[in-house]
Amino acid sequence: MVAAITSAGYTADGASADFNWGDGDVWRKSANNTKWCLIGCSIGDFGTIAAFQFVFTDSGWSPMMIMALAMFNGIMTSIALETAILSAQMALNEAFRVAIGMSLISMLSMEAAMNIVDLVLTGGAKLTWWVIVPMLVAGFLTPWPYNYWRLKKYNAACH
């Protein structure tokens, strides 16, 4: 019975087919997908932090409120960028649905990683020349395995 279930691609009693984490082609494609997500998230995230750091300096917002808004804006700009990229391949409303559904977990983990690095290294929502690279590295590496897994398991990607 277990063999019949696992041969159909499902799990039973903790048994499942071995998952291959060593597929170089999938790692490359998932890295490309992660890169586009990182570009979109970074635009909104860095833009929000920079706006509060350089323009709205006396806003009264706490660093945590700024970071929450930066995460939200990062996700929104990533969805907008991914929708624009996908709209070349499909209808705009379908591209929007795919952009939201396929990459939300990736974007949330990316934004959380970037803002945690910012908080740990600068003590708040601050952009300095030396914090941007660690934020981008953390933002890329955190969701990359998930993007690989999703692409490998479901052959599903955002781009």
Where would I find each of the regions flagged by the language model?
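A cytosolic-side transmembrane-helix exit/cap motif
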Residues: T83-M90, N147-N155
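Alpha-helical transmembrane segments
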Residues: S62-G74, V131-G139
